[in-house]
Amino acid sequence: MNRGFSFSTKVATSLNRCNNRSNNISQSVSYNFINKPTTTTSSTTSASTTSQPSFSLPTSCNSNSPQSNLNSFRTKSQTISKFSSNLLGTALFEFQAFLIDDT
């Protein structure tokens, strides 16, 4: 039984790490989206003074409203993060219940 709880603790730790990485990526993308430097250079184009993001926006996004796009991105990423956390938490709970019942 101790082995089962040790394993489930390791799984929970791994899930927390994954969730933290997901949040860090989301925050990094959000930060870069808002705080992109106004002057960019690349090997193929000359310096630009636009404040547009360096990645292309999906067609469903409104290119005239970066803040709206960012809020939409945050909402979607938070929803996905919560869903995956709930799903994995439920699976972990069921696994622990199985271990307890099995002893």
Swiss-Prot record:
Biased composition, class Low complexity, residue ranges: 38-51
Q: Which domain of life is it from?
A: Eukaryota
The segment annotated Disordered runs over 38-70
Compositional bias (Polar residues): 52-70
The protein's name: Uncharacterized protein DDB_G0284161
